Every structure is written in structure tokens, then in C-alpha cells.
UniProtKB/Swiss-Prot annotation:
Entry's cofactor comment: Binds 1 [2Fe-2S] cluster.
Transmembrane segments: 38-60
Species annotation: Homo sapiens (Human)
Gene3D superfamilies hit by this protein: CDGSH iron-sulfur domain, mitoNEET-type
Oligomer and partners: Homodimer. Interacts with BCL2; the interaction is direct and disrupted by BIK interaction with BCL2. Interacts with BCL2L1. Interacts with ITPR1.
This protein's name: CDGSH iron-sulfur domain-containing protein 2
Amino acid sequence: MVLESVARIVKVQLPAYLKRLPVPESITGFARLTVSEWLRLLPFLGVLALLGYLAVRPFLPKKKQQKDSLINLKIQKENPKVVNEINIEDLCLTKAAYCRCWRSKTFPACDGSHNKHNELTGDNVGPLILKKKEV
């Protein structure tokens, strides 16, 4: 029953549909088509576009995946949450920079590793800078 229906569609209905399509003889004939003729061509052109896309899709470039999706790749991974506490009174320097990219070799202090991270990932992270207020 099902195969008979499929055979009827492929052998009878599809050829009849294609014969009724207003396909012009030349490229310039497309300019002379009426709106109703274009509307009759629309489903056929849509199916052709879909088949063309599905045929070309395997050859299209893949979306570029970010090199590393995790932020913290190596610092204190044994802890469920990394917290660094710094007493403000202990800031003897006039200015201190702290890492926010998790790439610093001297974590929590910033060593400029974010520059390489930004270059690789297209990110724009920078350090947290604390400085004493000048009186």
C-alpha cells in the first residue's frame, strides 16, 4: 500500500507537476514571468535551493570553536571555588594588579598573561588594578 503510493507519486504526479511548471526557454524568459507563474515556481525553486544547500554544506568551513571554553584551566582545581583574600591594609605598594584571566604564573598577581589569552581567544580581559587614593 505504501509503496504503491510512493510509486504513484514518483511515476505519475511528480512528472505531471514538473510538466505544468512555467519554466522559460531562456534566462531572459524569467523576466517575462507573471506573479502567478513565479508563485507556481516558488515551491520547486525552494526544494532546489534546499537540495543545493544540503549538497554544499559538508564543504562549508566549520564554525571556529574557541580554543578553551573553561576559564580556569590549572589554578587550584582541587577546590570547588577559588577565592583569594587580600587585606587592603597590606597593600604597601601604591598600585597592585591582580589576575582576572586565570593564566598568570604568579596568581593572584597579574603577570601580563592575559595579553596572550586575549590574542588567542579574541577576548578582552585585563587585570584588576588596585591603587591607593592620593591625598
